[in-house]
Design a protein with these regions (language model features):
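Active-site histidine-anchored catalytic micro-motif
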Residues: 1-135
Length: 135
């Protein structure tokens, strides 16, 4: 993945669905894992208002601040020269990966469940691991 923005929610549902279909697995599990510590994979409704709510809520919870002085709202992690401490915290809240059942060769999800990649510190190339296990 290469997200040009600092933060973005991107649907990866159809790509995961395609990989499951191509695998030929009829009964099993698929693991979808953000392979970076500043990104998440999660499942929820594909509704833009909800995504905007996530953005607002996470920014209120852990606001972006490139500084490293806690007295002014900065983060000690940013003393490393990075400015992405908030991204690490946001990933902890949203999680690392999802595991979805495969039944009859298809993703076994609820009617409103959709798989997303959530980038918290974009502008660089990142990977997603999709591991399909089953028969």
């Amino acid at each position: 993945m290469q997200i040009p923005e600092r933060r973005a929610i991107v649907s990866i549902h159809h790509e995961v669905d395609r990989l499951v279909a191509e695998s030929g697995v009829q009964d099993g599990l698929v693991l979808v894992n953000a392979m970076h510590i500043t990104a998440s994979v999660f499942i929820n409704d594909n509704e833009s208002g909800l995504h905007a709510d996530y953005e607002r809520w996470l920014e209120e919870l852990v606001p972006f601040n490139p500084g490293s002085d806690p007295a002014s709202g900065g983060y000690l992690h940013n003393r490393t020269g990075e400015d992405n401490a908030d991204a690490h915290h946001k990933r902890q809240v949203m999680g690392r990966e999802v595991v979805v059942a495969i039944t009859d060769g298809k993703l076994h999800l609820g009617p409103w469940e959709h798989i997303f990649y959530y980038e918290f510190d974009g502008r660089r190339r990142k990977r997603i691991l999709v591991k399909i296990i089953g028969q």
